[in-house]
């Protein structure tokens, strides 16, 4: 039987309009006025007054990742379950082979981690932490497997590659129509600052984390990457962008005619660096991530850039650890596992701040959470839009379902949320994944029906 969502407002990147939505199997059949004869053959679901968003897409998650001598709290089962509960119907995680391992090995390993365990659809980026003829020879096979986006690091010794390797990789990806997202921080200077902080007796202070990784060292790496991309004549994505200085470097590159896409995250939009100054170690350590959370002024700059279309996507960089795992760094801040849970709360936090504080329109929220990620990562128009022929991935967002976020209520195994005590403006009521009801009344009612997505090329 078909499903008819009646009485809602369909949200797109252009705004919202009153429209009913008819679902047939996994696809949207039509929207607008549904003929009575079709309505009579359908299960009618009353969504009066609710916003109907295209399923949210989180293009930056780290599930079941070994890091800092431990493993993230969330695997693909718990991570994807939290994702679907929060309205995210697609995640794109990172396959991460170690240096010396093949890309094919990394892809196979991540399929073993994810296949058959996901409550939402999923895809992979491929991490490039080494560059040689062997790695380059594997690129065509990655594209055949539906991997068209890649990740590189300008920091972390175990994962970073040199500037020359970045240049060669960008050129190789451009030829194939691929694109790279890059983590931009200046590794060498950060290491020196860490050594200085420890020598001055501040090695156990959580606040040493943001002090060691200031905004200008992120901006320097952004600038360097963009000059490398200019030399390679290749597009790039700056992931988890946090500050005004980096945005200035990106604006300069665009004035030169470069193609640059920008991602930010809810923690950089709704929190500020005051979280690191809590005298209680556990309270401060839970916010340790890289790059660090920045100032209120940086948050305002990011919102302004979102309004102007200068930042295209909001992902989470979900990389969760329990507070017990965070305690590994009680005597040495560099041993605190870096990362936050966020995949379950992204939609509600972004919607609330955007609408309550007039930061972003409904259309802007849809572009950042759904439409632009789908276009950027080769999923549009199958995903990212409610239109005839698209997957029936639909978030029913009820403006009357406000609630307070508490870590104890989260599905994440981290056991906490960085947005503890945050009151939402409305909430996710129902979620459909390819036409099947996965969330009802804010509770996951469906199973592990997530499918692997072979993605096309960037169309943003």
Model-flagged regions — what are they?
Residues 203-235, 286-287, 308, 312-314, ...:
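His/Asp/Glu-enriched, well-ordered alpha-helical/loop segment
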Residues 1-55:
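Histidine-rich, glycine-flanked metal-binding segment
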Residues 134-314:
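Histidine/acidic residue-rich metal-binding segments in metalloenzymes
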Residues 88-90, 120, 148, 312:
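Short acidic/polar active-site loop segments enriched in Thr and Asp
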Residues 104-120, 168-182:
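Alpha-helix-loop-beta-strand connector modules within alpha/beta enzyme cores
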């Amino acid at each position: 039987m078909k499903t008819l969502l009646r009485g809602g407002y369909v949200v797109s990147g252009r705004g919202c309009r009153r429209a009913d939505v008819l679902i047939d199997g996994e696809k949207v059949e039509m929207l607008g006025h549904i003929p009575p004869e079709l309505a009579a053959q359908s299960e009618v679901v009353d969504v009066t007054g609710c916003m109907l968003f295209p399923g949210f897409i989180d293009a930056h998650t780290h599930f079941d990742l070994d890091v800092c001598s431990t493993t993230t709290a969330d695997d693909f089962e718990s991570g994807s379950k939290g994702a679907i509960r929060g309205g995210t119907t697609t995640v794109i995680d990172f396959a991460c082979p170690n240096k010396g391992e093949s890309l094919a090995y990394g892809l196979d390993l991540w399929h073993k981690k994810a296949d058959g365990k996901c409550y939402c659809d999923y895809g992979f980026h491929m991490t490039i932490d080494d560059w040689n003829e062997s790695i380059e020879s594997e690129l065509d096979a990655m594209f055949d497997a539906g991997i068209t986006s890649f990740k590189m690091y300008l920091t972390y010794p175990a994962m970073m590659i040199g500037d020359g390797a970045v240049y060669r990789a960008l050129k190789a990806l451009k030829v194939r129509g691929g694109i790279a997202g890059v983590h931009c921080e200046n590794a060498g200077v950060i290491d020196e600052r860490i050594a200085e902080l420890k020598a001055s007796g501040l090695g156990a202070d959580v606040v040493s984390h943001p002090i060691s990784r200031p905004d200008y060292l992120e901006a320097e790496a952004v600038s360097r990457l963009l000059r490398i991309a200019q030399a390679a004549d290749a597009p790039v994505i700056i992931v988890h962008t946090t500050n005004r200085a980096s945005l200035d470097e990106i604006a300069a590159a665009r004035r030169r005619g470069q193609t640059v896409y920008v991602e930010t995250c809810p923690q950089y939009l709704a929190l500020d660096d005051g979280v690191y100054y809590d005298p209680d170690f556990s309270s401060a350590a839970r916010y340790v991530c890289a790059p660090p959370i920045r100032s209120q002024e940086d948050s305002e700059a990011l919102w302004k850039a979102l309004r102007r279309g200068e930042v295209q996507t909001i992902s989470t960089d979900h990389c969760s650890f329990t507070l017990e795992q965070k305690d590994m760094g009680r005597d040495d801040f560099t041993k605190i596992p870096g990362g936050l849970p966020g995949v379950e709360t992204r939609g509600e936090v972004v919607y609330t701040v955007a609408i309550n504080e007039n930061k972003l329109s409904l259309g802007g929220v849809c572009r950042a959470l759904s439409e632009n990620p789908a276009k950027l990562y080769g999923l549009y128009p199958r995903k990212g839009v409610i239109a005839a022929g698209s997957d029936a991935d639909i978030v029913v967002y009820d403006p009357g379902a406000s609630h307070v976020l508490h870590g104890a209520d989260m599905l994440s195994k981290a056991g906490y949320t960085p947005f503890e005590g945050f009151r939402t403006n409305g909430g996710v009521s129902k979620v459909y994944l390819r036409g099947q009801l996965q969330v009802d009344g804010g509770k996951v009612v469906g199973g592990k029906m997530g499918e692997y997505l072979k993605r096309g090329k960037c169309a943003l």
